[in-house]
């Protein structure tokens, strides 16, 4: 777990810097830059959402397949070749589908004129997003996920911030802004490609003769269907809002969703480095190590996500008061998404364990249930409750999905991520919330957000240490204290 902790610290730095920049972008700059035309903000989100979804199909599950088989395949060059040729063929296929069925696609999506005029950008994004995911998988297989995470979480968001400011203050019209903004996805691909090339991680062999193609492609197929299902679910709410409501509502939903979804950041950093370690442990049938990774991921994610939830929900009215009036209607979107992600965090790296185990086929079945639930709940709840309904649907779907996976791992592998520390942490979070909810407000929202958040950390950190809720977090706190307080 030491590798996980050290890598997670590095990754978390990028994630939290990215989260801070993303928060400034999403909560302050985006709403103000697009206050007069929120549909432009909605368009950007829809373009990226569709591109990410389609790129999941074009890569055919290769990123996770690469991580899964990299430790056991001797012919690395052939695996590299296979991992590049399949996404390339997938991209060419998506290009053909677009040109042959463009009008039918527009009708199916109930695309607005603004979306139709800019739809081709999706195809270009598909290429760069897809191959960036492949390069990220290569980095993770070398236990070096820090570079792609930094590029995606920090570099791209700083780039976006600069462009948004230029657009906000009138130096770029929207058409020019959009082109330069989307060019950033080419830049992040190019930077990561050069890093991999410099580290000599591309020893290509233009052959696949020595690979167990049936096993690899079979695994890839199930991972692909599962991954596509998850990606569809994570973007479906936004897509259905765009089709059933309008692009303006997509913009309003995006801001609220971002705030609620922020608590899953620690899970991303832990999962990024845990994946190859789980793959190695399960390859050796080391279930004790797998259980350790499972339990520690759960408690670490719960503690950090829980603290973030306290900071967000105790300040929710102050946060929304900082937004332009048009964007202030998403309070309950934040609540539903936050609760769903809290449950997601407490269930640990369940998806990583299933995908890397002999039960990986169940990933397909659980994702099929997830997609079905998401489509049905979004359709009816969006019609009745608008963007609040979309958040309710997402919360129901994510919670049911993780509950099924939790039960599956317990039944098939006799493992669960919970311990006495889990109960202690949940009780601590409840006590903290009901105690701090009575903190007085000042007349300044920004001041309230800062001082309430500081109080949360001042009270929670000693409690974590006293009750010994997490070995890893305790060690991290001790290291930080020694570095900054004991250097006399």
Task: Walk through the language-model features, giving the residues of each.
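Interhelical loop/hinge segments that connect adjacent transmembrane helices in multipass membrane
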Residues: 1-4, 114, 170-180, 190-234, ...
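Signature of the first transmembrane helix
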Residues: 2-63, 91-99, 125, 218-247, ...
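Membrane-interface junctions at transmembrane-helix termini in multi-pass inner-membrane proteins
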Residues: 5, 69-72, 128-154, 338-369, ...
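Transmembrane helical elements of multi-pass membrane transporters/channels
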Residues: 7-23, 180-196, 209-280, 300-301, ...
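Interfacial segments at transmembrane-helix termini and the short loops linking adjacent helices
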Residues: 38-40, 102-122, 312-342, 348
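Helix-loop junctions and terminal segments of transmembrane helices
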Residues: 58-74, 141, 256, 260-298, ...
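Hydrophobic alpha-helical transmembrane segments
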Residues: 150-165, 169-198, 219, 368-373, ...
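Membrane-proximal transmembrane or re-entrant/amphipathic helices at the cytosolic face
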Residues: 434-488
């Amino acid at each position: 777990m030491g590798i996980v902790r050290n890598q997670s610290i590095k990754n978390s730095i990028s994630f939290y810097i990215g989260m801070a920049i993303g928060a400034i972008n999403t909560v302050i700059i985006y709403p103000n830059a697009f206050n007069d035309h929120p549909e432009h903000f909605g368009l950007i989100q829809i373009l990226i959402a569709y591109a990410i979804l389609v790129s999941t199909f074009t890569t055919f599950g290769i990123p996770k397949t690469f991580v899964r088989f990299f430790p056991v395949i001797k012919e690395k060059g052939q695996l590299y070749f296979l991992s590049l040729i399949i996404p390339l063929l997938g991209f060419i296929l998506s290009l053909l589908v677009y040109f042959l069925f463009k009008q039918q696609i527009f009708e199916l999506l109930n695309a607005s004129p603004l979306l139709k005029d800019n739809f081709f950008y999706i195809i270009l994004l598909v290429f760069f997003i897809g191959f960036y995911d492949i390069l990220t998988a290569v980095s993770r297989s070398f236990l070096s996920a820090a570079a792609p995470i930094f590029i995606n979480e920090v570099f791209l968001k700083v780039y976006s911030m600069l462009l948004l400011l230029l657009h906000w203050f009138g130096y770029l019209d929207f058409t020019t802004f959009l082109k330069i903004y989307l060019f950033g996805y080419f830049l992040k691909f190019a930077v990561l490609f050069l890093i991999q090339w410099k580290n000599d991680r591309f020893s290509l062999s233009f052959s696949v003769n020595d690979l167990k193609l049936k096993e690899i492609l079979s695994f890839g197929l199930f991972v692909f269907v599962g991954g596509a299902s998850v990606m569809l679910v994570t973007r479906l709410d936004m897509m259905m809002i765009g089709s059933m409501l309008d692009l303006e509502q997509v913009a309003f939903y995006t801001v609220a969703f971002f705030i609620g979804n922020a608590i899953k950041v620690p899970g991303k950093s832990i999962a990024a480095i845990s994946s190859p370690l789980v793959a190695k442990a399960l390859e050796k049938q080391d279930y004790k190590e797998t259980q350790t990774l499972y339990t520690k991921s759960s408690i670490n994610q719960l503690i950090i996500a829980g603290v973030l939830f306290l900071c967000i929900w105790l300040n929710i009215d102050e946060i929304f008061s900082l937004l332009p009036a048009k964007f202030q209607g998403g309070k309950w979107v934040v609540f539903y998404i936050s609760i769903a992600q809290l449950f997601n965090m407490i269930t640990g790296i369940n998806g990583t364990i299933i995908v890397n185990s002999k039960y990986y086929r169940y990933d397909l079945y659980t994702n099929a249930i997830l997609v079905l639930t998401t489509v049905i709940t979004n359709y009816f709840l969006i019609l009745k409750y608008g963007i609040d309904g979309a958040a309710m649907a997402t919360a129901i779907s994510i919670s049911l999905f993780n509950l099924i996976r939790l039960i599956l791992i317990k039944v098939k592998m006799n493992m669960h991520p919970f311990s006495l520390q889990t109960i202690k942490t949940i009780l601590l979070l409840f006590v903290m919330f009901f105690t701090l909810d009575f903190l007085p407000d000042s007349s300044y929202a920004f001041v309230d957000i800062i001082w309430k958040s500081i109080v949360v950390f001042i009270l929670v950190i000693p409690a974590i240490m006293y009750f010994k809720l997490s070995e890893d977090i305790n060690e991290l706190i001790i290291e930080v204290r020694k570095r900054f307080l004991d250097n006399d």
